[in-house]
Amino acid sequence: YFEAMLEAPDMAFLGVRGLLMQAIRRDDTREALRLANQADVLRPGTPWVLSKLFELQAGAQQWEAANKTLLQGSGAKNAQTGRRRRAVVALALSEEAAASGDHKQAIKQARAACELDSHLIPALAAHVRHLAAAGQMRKAAKTLLAAWARNPHPDLAAAFGALGGPDEAPLDRVKRFQSLYKARPDDIESRLALAEASLAAS
């Protein structure tokens, strides 16, 4: 039925939509991606098509394509969702760059993810990790302390702990964690992070 609709120019889009929904229901990602791209060619910029295309591309870890889809307008109906999605894509691109040894691109994409969504903890932790991997330890610590002051989180405490390296003396670690505590002394996460560092030193 849907295949027959493809033959009529005025019905082709509806036919592609029907086939796309069938492909999604049977978990045929490759076919669903092909059909979503075809739907976008037939009616460029259709919000539901772009949203579905993004979801499929992200699920297949096609981050460059997902980024292009987002720039084309996915998430435009909800600006916050659009920014969050773009942040997630930037984070994924950051991790890909890091895996290939491109620290500069990894830092750039992680920073972009943080700018798009300052509450995306994995992006903040990745930004710090990539700065440290590039030997920018002071900048990594400064970035993390600023993020901690806004939004204390156990994953940020773990990233801060990793900045000391495996050979850091326990008392030096406690001193470093005191600066984390001072960035947000009123928060329970600050007290927990300092307590854990102190316990490890005793």
Regions found by a protein language model. Give the residues of each.
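Repeat-based scaffolding regions
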Residues: Y1-S202
